[in-house]
């Protein structure tokens, strides 16, 4: 392990490769674990409305620890923070394997994910700079989406075979991520020596929130990414209930195949964004965001598998093109104002608050008996209107 604080800014440096591998394995575990645990809930006869609650306890950890994880990422070598966070994920997955309440185990994975996220994105600005940052984000998103693709499918397919095997595979993936983190160069902490008083940390985090919100560009990025990821997570759970109703298929694997189509599309869209969008032309991504909602609405009305695959892949392409430039904009502007770790922590608060709100509304809609197809139609229409409003606001300001 290198102790050097100097970095090779190449996109394919040793450190960047280690980050990408660690991110792939960690995200693979996250996505496989979601579908494996959903299969466990079905096997143990939990009610349908409890499924989004599983994700809500996960994102609740992000929100609870949001004031602190950004400072953790900036106060220590980010590679070591990533290793510790993946260790927590490993512990959470293993606890579910050994029969601990799945909601408690998944909460522990959420704590690890909360600590991991500011470090994984913040380290990109330390390993590469300038014009390569958007491309580095493209690599990170491509790695993440490839992991979503393979992890989601693996979780569903293995769960159809045996739930315990699926859960064990998740723990193994997290263990591999811990090992990959060892090979990330130990870089100097970005902002060492900060106070660890919880009150002052909370106050500092709120100051970072205020600073980013007052800046028009970072506020635009925060709202856009929050809407996107809140909608993306809700779509995942919508698919779990939509498949048996619209397609008449009741296995665990088919919703994961459909999620995989979104993942493939996001890889394509992220690559296109890296080539076609710069920090100076971020507004080019906005039409894609509006079209996401329109295509979700059309998708909800389908009753055949092949059109569903095609439309979900299109949703992914539009999503990748939409979110990658917004992520890069926030990292670049945030690094200069509040530090990359704090910027990503604020972003996580926004995104996970949106997820919590959207999942809560979705769970409530399912609980009161609204059919899943009308839920999907309303969901797509509201998302398109929200992104349209954001674009109008951005152009005026």
From Swiss-Prot:
It comes from the Bacteria. Its main location: membrane. It is a multi-pass membrane protein. NCBIfam families: PRK11195.1 (NF008397). Residues 39-52, 112-144, 188-226, 278-280, 326-343, 388-397 are cytoplasmic. One of its GO terms (molecular function) is lysophospholipid:sodium symporter activity. It holds the Pfam family MFS_1. It is found in: Cell inner membrane. Belongs to the major facilitator superfamily. LplT (TC 2.A.1.42) family. The keyword Membrane applies. Keywords: Cell inner membrane, Cell membrane, Lipid transport, Membrane, Transmembrane, Transmembrane helix, Transport. The gene is lplT. Gene3D superfamilies: MFS general substrate transporter like domains (1.20.1250.20). One of its GO terms (cellular component) is plasma membrane. The lineage of its organism: Bacteria, Pseudomonadati, Pseudomonadota, Gammaproteobacteria, Enterobacterales. Catalyzes the facilitated diffusion of 2-acyl-glycero-3-phosphoethanolamine (2-acyl-GPE) into the cell. This is Lysophospholipid transporter LplT. The keyword Cell membrane applies. CDD domains: MFS_MefA_like. The chain crosses the membrane at residues 18-38, 53-73, 91-111, 145-165, 167-187, 227-247, 257-277, 281-301, 305-325, 344-364, 367-387. Residues 1-17, 74-90, 166, 248-256, 302-304, 365-366 are periplasmic.
